[in-house]
Amino acid sequence: GCVGHRKSCEHDKKNGCCYFMTCNCWHPMGQ
């Protein structure tokens, strides 16, 4: 599921989990 906000999207972009305006990392394989 959604893990919460990130201060920087850069790391999450590399993992393909950065959303548009809010930096929410989504883990498809878990909650």
Swiss-Prot record:
UniProt keyword annotations, A-Z: Calcium channel impairing toxin, Disulfide bond, Ion channel impairing toxin, Knottin, Neurotoxin, Secreted, Toxin, Voltage-gated calcium channel impairing toxin
Disulfide bonds: C2-C18, C9-C23
Primary subcellular site in the record, as a coarse category: secreted
Residue ranges the record marks as coiled coil: none
Tissue: Expressed by the venom gland.
Cellular component annotations (GO), alphabetically ordered: extracellular region
Superkingdom of the organism of origin: Eukaryota
One Gene Ontology molecular-function label: calcium channel regulator activity
Location relative to the cell: Secreted
UniProt keyword Secreted, yes or no: yes
Family from the record: Belongs to the neurotoxin 02 (plectoxin) family. 09 subfamily.
Summary of the function given for this chain in its UniProt record: Antagonist of L-type calcium channels (Cav1/CACNA1).
Domain description: The presence of a 'disulfide through disulfide knot' structurally defines this protein as a knottin.
Designated name of the protein: U6-ctenitoxin-Co1a
Organism: Ctenus ornatus (Brazilian spider)
